[in-house]
Amino acid sequence: MSVWNYVVTAHKPTNVTHSCVGNFTGPQELNLIIAKCTRIEIHLLTPQGLQCICLQPMLDVPIYGRIATLELFRPHGETQDLLFIATERYKFCVLQWDTEASEVITRAMGDVSDRIGRPTDNGQIGIIDPDCRLIGLHLYDGLFKVIPFDNKGQLKEAFNIRLEELQVLDIKFLYGCPKPTIVVLYQDNKDARHVKTYEVSLKDKDFIEGPWAQNNLDNGASLLIPVPPPLCGVLIIGEETIVYCSASAFKAIPIRPSITRAYGRVDADGSRYLLGDHNGLLHLLVITHEKEKVTGLKIELLGETSIASTISYLDNAFVFIGSSYGDSQLVKLNLQPDTKGSYVEVLERYVNLGPIVDFCVVDLERQGQGQVVTCSGAYKDGSLRIVRNGIGINEQASVELQGIKGMWSLRSATDDPYDTFLVVSFISETRVLAMNLEDELEETEIEGFNSQVQTLFCHDAVYNQLVQVTSNSVRLVSSTSRDLKNEWFAPVGYSVNVATANATQVLLATGGGHLVYLEIGDGVLNEVKYAKLDYDISCLDINPIGENPNYSNIAAVGMWTDISVRIYSLPDLNLITKEQLGGEIIPRSVLMCSFEGISYLLCALGDGHLLNFVLSMSTGELTDRKKVSLGTQPITLRTFSSKDTTHVFAASDRPTVIYSSNKKLLYSNVNLKEVSHMCPFNVAAFPDSLAIAKEGELTIGTIDEIQKLHIRSIPLGEHARRISHQEQTRTFALCSVKYTQSNADDPEMHFVRLLDDQTFEFISTYPLDQFEYGCSILSCSFSDDSNVYYCIGTAYVMPEENEPTKGRILVFIVEDGKLQLIAEKETKGAVYSLNAFNGKLLAAINQKIQLYKWASREDGGSRELQTECGHHGHILALYVQTRGDFIVVGDLMKSISLLIFKHEEGAIEERARDYNANWMSAVEILDDDIYLGAENNFNLFTVRKNSEGATDEERSRLEVVGEYHLGEFVNRFRHGSLVMRLPDSDVGQIPTVIFGTVNGVIGVIASLPHDQYLFLEKLQTNLRKVIKGVGGLSHEQWRSFYNEKKTVDAKNFLDGDLIESFLDLSRNRMEEISKAMSVPVEELMKRVEELTRLH
């Protein structure tokens, strides 16, 4: 059953909603504080060289609320700033930095909600009087809430003042007023905009008419900027004019039509401001003045940035641009323009996936691991983002080299901690590379090696020696003098095909199934044993994993013909174990290794499959056989160590790192395309590095310790709103909109675009009609037709209509990389959703669900969509999911309903519905009986089909079984997983749904077995007692389902972010929880670590 769900964040919010600058962590420290809706980040500005600064992260914490206000202020008597935060659910807190503990502590907290009152339409406003006499909040229409400070800087009890103006657009405190004074920008009932000022009388708890007012401003006036002393007054930013206003002055300048989204003050005296508009243009506004008298305004275009939601001027011409529609940026404003005339230089980009309007889960590499491709950003900052889980390689150096056949690292002395040489083998030669003094790879020589032939294997050996195996000999060379000391030759007429070695032993195989075992002494190579096997040998390994680090008692041998892997004893080469691998694919690489004290034999096949066995070191027995698919090409296996633990690198077309946790083997993708060979290369300049050979180049790099999400960005310059993938044609199709600034008649152009799924280039475009929007997209096939099609649902959005009255369904086929329109069908409304349904097409058109069949035309020619049946009864059917004959509909305001298609009657009927009023934003089917919904108050809920109900009335109700406040606006759910699903993992069998949100969150909802749910619920309850929310905010309240009508505790949903934070606790706190639950700490850690593998 999918009743018990675990909700966890795979990618944190990245949409920057607020930012401010001040001295928060110390009187002399300058901080940038960033809010990302439900998280705050504190950064320290540190100089980096003379010309640059760096943002050093100090803290990143969740807030149990959606941040509505973020302001720094400094009450009397404080040496550094405090941080005021107010949330959308009417909680506030004042935070202070605790230098000792490097964390924030709560100075004050409270609830400012009123029982009655209509929440403001234009969002909450929170402001602080510049002289720190009070905090002002506009939360409900017609009310202004005041929280006064006492003379010690402590907050006193809040009170409300009636505010006549109902449609408030902005409120700010004015500087330099003897009594606290606010300036209010509002709209009257004739849609004209005005500004008024009020003094706040703390004694009378009321307003007194202020010093001035200004009527009939620019109709687009939307932002107030209070100007500090000595000038004081306020700037009123409109769409076509900017006005400076004070009791004694009025100055205005016209500007090019634009909507200003954000501003940042440059100087303390307030004479210069940065303005960011809806097109991402950054302007500098200057107030010209003679002493305290304002003489005029000037505005200048500086250049382009991401579309700014916040602008924070840092220092020395460095500016932080926070964005909700694109990546946030650290920019520098230069005195001289660049070649394109821009004064803006982007120094750093901070990835933002928001808003994720749509996404699809694809397996582009076809190896059982989902990648999420999102439609991210908006307007000119629109992009596709490819998000995948994996291990990153940080490149340190690289050289171009073609045709590498093998690589080994060697030391110049047995006890040397670092490697010196990197031996690289090619088809007819061997080269030796080493690091020079400049830390670059350069070619060198080991004189005793044969460099005219391909090397099959080499290794460090005891007594400061090196061993090189080629097709005709084994050479033993001094690592200090580099001279040849001894050589063993292959028998005449035989050549060595495969070989392996360790510090004291060499094992090699020649044609005809001959196996030869040599031992290495000081300057001598002794042939100890020879055996003739019944088939040719494909791979060998004698990696010592027993007691002696230099000597192995057993050898692993992979065979041609009988497709087996065998264990032989050393030195006498007696067969101990033989394991048939089955199938026809030969083993290409075998490796004995030890993880967490367990010995394994890994055996890689030529088709990208990997078998692993537990290997008994005493008996040589192989048990517990498991098989996974890592790629499609042959794999070569090598061990390397990272953080003092053994890992295995499997090089192939899908390189993978194999490691062990809780005594289970785990597999992580490496974020590289094909890798043919890898070997550890631990040099002083780049400790713990790996040498990696891929197509045409050799790279030296270090490896990430942990796997995490890696994000690749494909900037589009337009806004992709819908996406679908078609595996058969290896393409994506998008519905996108391009905004043009120049052409005023038609500022938007809508397209269907086809992209190649490997290069992500546009390969074909179909323009939609004027006013026609792409609303839905689907890749599907129809009954008795083997082709695969893209279906696009559109709407004609006419300026004079409230709701579209017409649209189209377009059916395309991809031929030679081009979109060919095969059929189109007019509809009587917007096609909000398209689903493949029993070989037909199910469309949601305004309030109707309509089923189309794919039928031949009467003229017997091509095919067309023909109406089959439909179902009315929705306000707007926006989101539809299907399973078998069931149809689940998410309505604009009538929550979720369940329909069924009846084959006999050829009709669609309603089976059940949820009678709550939920304004839906996404739906998904978890299993036959449980449906998941997200709605516009940032909640998740699940409903259950009540098939067993005794009466019709009971059966017609979808019963709400789970409720949870996510705090995120979900745009889409999709089934899928971000991690490789493995047979031996506990979480491998847990079904997961991925979601994407406006703030750029990618999350996972996992349906748990009931016993696991109960265990984790108990852990969550105990964690709530130990982990206190920042600012005293309550976790329980935050996760309670909340809308205008009701607030109820979360049920049947668990907060995975809270549960996984168990792993970050100190040992003492872990023990506290362990005691409360009577479960050992190790067991708790193990169970929580398993959960982290869901994402």
Swiss-Prot record:
<dbReference type="InterPro" id="IPR011047">
    <property type="entry name" value="Quinoprotein_ADH-like_sf"/>
</dbReference>
<dbReference type="Pfam" id="PF03178">
    <property type="entry name" value="CPSF_A"/>
</dbReference>
<dbReference type="Pfam" id="PF23726">
    <property type="entry name" value="Beta-prop_RSE1_2nd"/>
</dbReference>
<dbReference type="InterPro" id="IPR018846">
    <property type="entry name" value="Beta-prop_RSE1/DDB1/CPSF1_1st"/>
</dbReference>
<dbReference type="GO" id="GO:0005634">
    <property type="term" value="C:nucleus"/>
</dbReference>
<dbReference type="InterPro" id="IPR050358">
    <property type="entry name" value="RSE1/DDB1/CFT1/CPSF1"/>
</dbReference>
<dbReference type="GO" id="GO:0016567">
    <property type="term" value="P:protein ubiquitination"/>
</dbReference>
<dbReference type="GO" id="GO:0003676">
    <property type="term" value="F:nucleic acid binding"/>
</dbReference>
<comment type="function">
    <text>Component of light signal transduction machinery. Involved in fruit pigmentation and fruit nutritional quality. Acts as a negative regulator of fruit pigmentation. Probably acts by participating in the CDD complex, a complex probably required to regulate the activity of ubiquitin conjugating enzymes. Repression of photomorphogenesis is probably mediated by ubiquitination and subsequent degradation of photomorphogenesis-promoting factors such as HY5.</text>
</comment>
<dbReference type="InterPro" id="IPR015943">
    <property type="entry name" value="WD40/YVTN_repeat-like_dom_sf"/>
</dbReference>
<dbReference type="InterPro" id="IPR004871">
    <property type="entry name" value="Cleavage/polyA-sp_fac_asu_C"/>
</dbReference>
<comment type="similarity">
    <text>Belongs to the DDB1 family.</text>
</comment>
<keyword id="KW-0539">Nucleus</keyword>
<keyword id="KW-0607">Phytochrome signaling pathway</keyword>
<comment type="subunit">
    <text>Probable component of the CDD complex, which probably also contains DET1.</text>
</comment>
<protein>
    <recommendedName>
        <fullName>DNA damage-binding protein 1</fullName>
    </recommendedName>
</protein>
<dbReference type="Pfam" id="PF10433">
    <property type="entry name" value="Beta-prop_RSE1_1st"/>
</dbReference>
<dbReference type="GO" id="GO:0009585">
    <property type="term" value="P:red, far-red light phototransduction"/>
</dbReference>
<comment type="pathway">
    <text>Protein modification; protein ubiquitination.</text>
</comment>
